[in-house]
Amino acid sequence: MFNILKQVGDYAKGSVQAAKYIGQGLAVTFDHMRRRPVTVQYPYEKLIPSERFRGRIHFEFDKCIACEVCVRVCPINLPVVDWEFNKAVKKKELKHYSIDFGVCIFCGNCVEYCPTNCLSMTEEYELASYDRHELNYDNVALGRLPYKVTQDPMVTPLRELGYLPKGVLSPHDLPKGSQRAGKHPQEILEEMETTSTKSE
């Protein structure tokens, strides 16, 4: 008899504990339901990277002196520098330069230690491709001018999630009236109506 009562008591305790955990989970769910969305609707919305963002490396062929400092400071000896020694002017002549972004860890050592500043980090981060060999950028691909999110007219650049006010660690901690990333469909329709009336 005592054993049955103990089992019933344990079952009741377990039920109360399970109900408590379910209640805690639902409280978190309902708390998030009251908040504005923070989802970035990629690729139609993109975050503006911070000033020190380490994206695709930009290379200026004319500035490079083929010193190979970038290869020596790279933790994985990644940049491939092909050069020939010109006996007439007694200097190295750069023939080819390439970086494989499928292997690069974007540490920025090559940019920091380059004596002629021919390497720089850009804001580009969309390097995905179907073939891994396409990630091996030669001096022509590296020399392409960097692309910025704010230059694309089809994309809405979002600054809110990239730059939060001082002391705010989460976008949810912002005051209720402040602008947030992610708009309700009604707000988007209102914006479209106002822009169409202004253009007329």
From Swiss-Prot:
It is found in: Cellular thylakoid membrane. Its cofactor is [4Fe-4S] cluster. GO terms for molecular function: 4 iron, 4 sulfur cluster binding; iron ion binding; NADH dehydrogenase (ubiquinone) activity; quinone binding. The gene is ndhI. HAMAP family: NDH1_NuoI. Gene3D superfamilies: 3.30.70.3270. Coiled coil: none annotated. GO terms for biological process: photosynthesis, light reaction. It is a peripheral membrane protein. [4Fe-4S] cluster 2 binds at C74, C104, C107, C110. This is NAD(P)H-quinone oxidoreductase subunit I. The lineage of its organism: Bacteria, Bacillati, Cyanobacteriota, Cyanophyceae, Oscillatoriophycideae. GO terms for cellular component: plasma membrane-derived thylakoid membrane. InterPro entries: 4Fe4S_Fe-S-bd, 4Fe4S_Fe_S_CS, NADH_quinone_OxRdtase_chainI, NDHI. Residues 172-200 are annotated as: Disordered. Belongs to the complex I 23 kDa subunit family. NDH-1 shuttles electrons from an unknown electron donor, via FMN and iron-sulfur (Fe-S) centers, to quinones in the respiratory and/or the photosynthetic chain. The immediate electron acceptor for the enzyme in this species is believed to be plastoquinone. Couples the redox reaction to proton translocation, and thus conserves the redox energy in a proton gradient. Pfam families: Fer4_7 (PF12838). Its EC number is 7.1.1.-. SUPFAM superfamilies: 4Fe-4S ferredoxins (SSF54862).
